[in-house]
Amino acid sequence: MVIVDDSFAWLITWTTYGSRLPGDERSYVSNTFVPGEGYIRKQNTPGTPYTADHAPSRERARELQRWDTVQLDPEEAFLVAQSLVAAASKRGWRIARAAIMADHVHAVVLDCPIDGPAVRRVLKGNAYAVLRDHWGKSKHCWTTGGSDRQKRGEEAILTAIQYVADQEYKLAEIIDMQAVRCAAK
């Protein structure tokens, strides 16, 4: 794959509904709940470390959860991968690498608009439509929002691609616009 050093990509991440709540011990990019004070705005700028393991945020999120928690199975993850490839291909975008796990999705997207949140909305919306058709009904499957981290230059883009490639527990992935099923571990 050829990457021009003045190019950019988006490392886009979103989660399945209820599976990775604010306050999660693994890490999270969400507002942090401080009892008696309200919320501290999420930190989602390049170079900002992730926040992790905050019990008050986790407990508050569980209280506010309105639908069942969603965990993708291998077939659903592969459908998501195929939908991301189709959405990107239709728009002339490239997904260099994506990883679909039971509880979240990472995608490195190139040749796309500078508006990361818009790119994420397109990908999530297309994946939702495919899952809705698969389930035969509407079901709240994604958390609102997500993370859009812009990567500029070859080194940053290749680092993001490697980060996504190294994800554990992948059910499906995309390797240079090819959806692939992952072997069960």
What kind of region is each of these model predictions?
Residues 1-185:
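Short catalytic/metal-binding and nucleic-acid-binding patches
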